Amino acid sequence: MEAPDPGQPLYLDATARDTPSIALGCAARETLRMADLLDTMLDDAADALRRSDRAAIAQVRKQDDALDRLDAAIKRYIAD
């Protein structure tokens, strides 16, 4: 079984957008998840650079791409 894409939002509920306070709560929850992913990515990046591990650096780039996708999804959710 393939691991879920961390760049896909888990908490942005389209049906909650009818109630702004709930929608903002969903966005806040997703933003907190994004912060956790960023913390992990920064730890992984520091470790990869210390070891000069090209494969680990490539994995950090994938983590960064996932964060970019998640950031864009949160912005779309708030703006629409």
Regions found by a protein language model. Name each.
Residues 1-80:
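Cytosolic, long alpha-helical scaffolding segments
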